[in-house]
Amino acid sequence: MAKTVKKSGPKKAKRNVPNGVAHIQSTFNNTIVSITDTAGEVISWSSAGASGFKGARKGTPFAAQTAAEAAARRALDQGMRQIEVLVRGPGSGRETAIRALQVAGLEITLIRDVTPLPHNGCRRPKRRRV
């Protein structure tokens, strides 16, 4: 039977990345924040679900704020100072996540909305009758 070899030390090497891009995907059910370098390699990420929220609470602005703070904290540990922010989706945590990134100590140089809009593509789901 093969023996498992135990590795010691940090799992991921710390890199010095001064600027990057924060991708905020905000849906009605969750908010995902990924911070990448300029080449697109993910430095840190977090989501409302990964921050400990479950169910309907994942879609709240407070959950988005918590997720953005967690991702920003890890990015600051990697040496990140300046970020561009790309926001995608219609969720309620968009503005809150951007504000949380700024409060965490990251300098925001650009905010761009990259929500995909169909040019009359697929048929929309039927309306909910509650």
From Swiss-Prot:
Looking at the UniProt record for this protein, which Gene Ontology cellular component terms does it annotate, in alphabetical order? ribonucleoprotein complex; ribosome
Q: Please provide an example of a Pfam family that matches this protein in its UniProt record.
A: Ribosomal_S11
By sequence similarity, the record places it as follows:
Belongs to the universal ribosomal protein uS11 family.
Classification via InterPro entries: Ribosomal_uS11, Ribosomal_uS11_bac-type, Ribosomal_uS11_CS, Ribosomal_uS11_sf
Top-level division of the source organism's lineage: Bacteria
Q: Which UniProt keywords apply?
A: Ribonucleoprotein, Ribosomal protein, RNA-binding, rRNA-binding
Q: Which GO terms describe its biological process?
A: translation
Task: Give the function comment from the record.
Answer: Located on the platform of the 30S subunit, it bridges several disparate RNA helices of the 16S rRNA. Forms part of the Shine-Dalgarno cleft in the 70S ribosome.
Q: Name one GO molecular function term.
A: rRNA binding
Kindly give the HAMAP family that the UniProt entry links to this protein. Ribosomal_uS11
Protein name, UniProt field:
Small ribosomal subunit protein uS11
The annotated subunit structure for this chain is: Part of the 30S ribosomal subunit. Interacts with proteins S7 and S18. Binds to IF-3.
Gene symbol of the encoding locus: rpsK
